[in-house]
């Protein structure tokens, strides 16, 4: 029986009421080396199989007086642990304790200055123990308390919000009307730091401790002879998951990378060199580029491209796994025939997947999964077809934690800091039919763009950068001749969470250099344009 994560780490429970900022609360606590977990606000305390050290109630787009407003389980307030309500969370605390919440004619959106009110009582002053005077915070509310509950006192106020923060007179229950989880609240991290102290949490959630405990957990799950399969893309998540699995069970982990013909320049060879030769991972690279490209021929619809790539991937992966299983059976038979049963390995029972915590958050968020904008490429279909059990060693981690874990595992910095790359690869960055010629054009242009970003020392300042091949042609003049060639669009996004993003403001000299190189070196391209769209309204990828 594997040890539950809550028995290994002191944990804070975050109840999500549908706020766009809920995931940030989780991140802020993790950054303080405290494990925390987000669950929907409908979670009943009595149904938890673990006891949190503290509970945080998130904000919400609802009003507490709405008939359909989400309600917190009243047992939260009798669980005997500290509680912190944020925005709607404060209002929910007040609503449950006899306070009054009303719509306000002076709504607060944006920056505000809160004045801390000290009482000279340790537990009342604990949340703002290091704050003095007025502090800039971020407000985003149309409702506010018009009457505080009798058992609460004001611990912060603004000119328009007399109950900007409150504390229970005798219990460790606190509420703040502002959003300490966003960076616009200048001392928000200090507030969470104080709440962690109030909860008396051990601050031992680090990637150093995670490695040892996760390796132990993997070994308990897989057993001494079990074998694990893993589909590797060469991205950060799958590479870190593969290296962690290799550390846990060695060559009983079999990684398979499928070259689908729409990878970046020399990607398959580079990943093999790094994972197999440098890090010792048992990796097989399957060149199925012809198979993928033949099925993608004349296909323009992005969803159809995704489906073709997903289905073809499963077919190729299953065929390779059949070979590995046959090899394993032959090795087992040979070991038994030689009278060496201890050398026989077990069957393939598990499939490694690099699920991250944001994927988990999306699935359990109170407002439910967002409307599907794009079909995500994953290996879920393999589980049904191959009857494998899923093993997800990274499912508790955010992206920055995965990168930190990768560095500790010895993965080179240039790989753990790599920009995200979509599962369908360049097929969804070619806005038209996918042919080998189109792939080569985009590979070359993208390679120039990324090389110049690295040479300028900008790569780590940008969250994601790539080139897109547009389905249009433009008139140009090259070598005194009229040309009618293709157009490349450059995209670079800056973001902290990939939920919102801004375009990266390159210097004009940089853009000129990249444009000149692409139009001079990439045959068939005579024009380069820059995408300056933010997310929203645009997504980071074009398709």
Swiss-Prot record:
BP-aspect Gene Ontology terms? GMP biosynthetic process
Where in the sequence is the signal peptide annotated?
Answer: none
Residues recorded as binding XMP, renumbered to this chain, are 306, 480, 535, 541
Among the GO molecular function terms of this UniProt record, one is:
GMP synthase (glutamine-hydrolyzing) activity
> Active site located where?
87, 179, 181
| Catalysed reactions listed for this entry | XMP + L-glutamine + ATP + H2O = GMP + L-glutamate + AMP + diphosphate + 2 H(+)
- What region holds the GMPS ATP-PPase domain? 205-418
Gene3D superfamilies assigned to the protein according to its UniProt record, in alphabetical order: 3.30.300.10, 3.40.50.880, HUPs (3.40.50.620)
Give the binding site residues for ATP: 233-239
The answer to whether the entry has keyword Nucleus is no
Residues forming the Glutamine amidotransferase type-1 domain are 11-205
Please list the cofactors this protein needs.
Mg(2+)
Mind telling me which InterPro entries this protein's record contains? Answer: Class_I_gatase-like, GATASE, GMP_synth_C, GMP_synth_GATase, GMP_synthase, GMPS_ATP_PPase_dom, NAD/GMP_synthase, Rossmann-like_a/b/a_fold
Q: Recorded E.C. number(s)?
A: 6.3.5.2
- Quaternary structure annotation from Swiss-Prot or TrEMBL: Homodimer.
What is this protein called in UniProt?
GMP synthase [glutamine-hydrolyzing]
Organism the protein comes from: Mycosarcoma maydis (Corn smut fungus)
Q: Which gene is transcribed and translated to give this protein?
A: GUA1
């Amino acid at each position: 029986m594997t040890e539950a994560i809550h028995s290994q780490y002191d944990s804070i429970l975050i109840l999500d009421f549908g706020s766009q900022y809920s995931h940030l609360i989780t991140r802020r606590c993790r950054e303080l080396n405290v494990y925390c977990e987000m669950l929907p606000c409908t979670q009943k305390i009595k149904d938890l199989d673990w006891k949190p050290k503290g509970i945080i109630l998130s904000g919400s787009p609802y009003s507490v007086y709405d008939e359909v407003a989400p309600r917190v389980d009243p047992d939260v307030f009798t669980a005997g642990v500290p509680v912190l309500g944020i925005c709607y969370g404060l209002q929910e605390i007040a609503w449950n304790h006899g306070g009054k919440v009303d719509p306000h004619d002076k709504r607060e959106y944006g920056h505000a200055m809160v004045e801390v009110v000290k009482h000279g009582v340790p537990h009342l002053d604990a949340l703002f123990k290091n704050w003095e005077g007025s502090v800039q915070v971020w407000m985003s509310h149309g409702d506010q308390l018009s009457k505080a509950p009798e058992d609460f006192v004001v611990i912060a106020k603004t000119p328009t919000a007399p109950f900007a923060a409150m504390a229970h007179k005798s219990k460790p229950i606190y509420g703040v009307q502002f959003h300490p989880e966003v960076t616009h609240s200048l001392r928000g991290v200090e507030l969470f730091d104080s709440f962690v102290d109030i909860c008396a949490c051990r601050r031992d959630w680090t990637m150093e401790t995670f490695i040892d405990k996760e390796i132990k957990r993997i070994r308990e799950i897989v057993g001494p002879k079990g074998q694990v399969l893993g589909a590797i893309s060469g991205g950060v998540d799958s590479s870190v998951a593969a290296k962690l699995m290799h550390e846990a069970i060695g060559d009983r982990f079999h990684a398979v990378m499928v070259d689908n013909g729409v990878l970046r320049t020399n990607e398959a060879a580079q990943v093999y060199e790094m994972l197999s030769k440098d890090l010792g991972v048992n990796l097989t690279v399957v060149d199925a580029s012809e198979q993928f490209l033949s099925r993608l021929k004349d296909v323009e619809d992005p969803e159809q491209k995704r489906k073709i790539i997903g289905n073809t991937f499963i077919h190729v992966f299953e065929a390779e796994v059949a070979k590995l299983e046959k090899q394993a059976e032959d090795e087992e038979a040979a070991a038994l025939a030689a009278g060496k049963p201890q050398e026989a390995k077990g069957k393939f029972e598990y499939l490694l997947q690099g699920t991250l915590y944001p994927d988990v958050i999306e699935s359990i968020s109170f407002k439910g999964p967002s409307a599907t904008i794009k079909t995500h490429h994953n290996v879920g279909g393999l589980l049904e077809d191959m009857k494998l059990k899923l093993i997800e060693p990274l499912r508790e981690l955010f992206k920055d934690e995965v990168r930190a874990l990768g560095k500790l595992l010895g993965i080179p910095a240039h790989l753990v800091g790599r920009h995200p790359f979509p599962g369908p690869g360049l097929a969804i960055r070619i806005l038209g039919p996918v042919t080998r010629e189109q792939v080569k054009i985009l590979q070359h242009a993208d390679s120039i763009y990324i090389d110049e970003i690295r040479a300028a020392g900008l790569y780590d300042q940008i969250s994601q950068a790539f080139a897109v091949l547009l389905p249009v042609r433009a008139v140009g003049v090259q070598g005194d001749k009229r040309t009618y060639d293709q157009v490349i669009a450059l995209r670079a996004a800056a973001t902290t969470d990939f939920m919102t993003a801004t375009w990266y403001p390159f210097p004009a000299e940089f853009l000129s250099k990249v444009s000149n190189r692409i139009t001079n070196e990439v045959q068939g391209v005579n024009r380069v344009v820059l995408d300056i769209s933010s997310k929203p309204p645009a997504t980071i990828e074009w398709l």
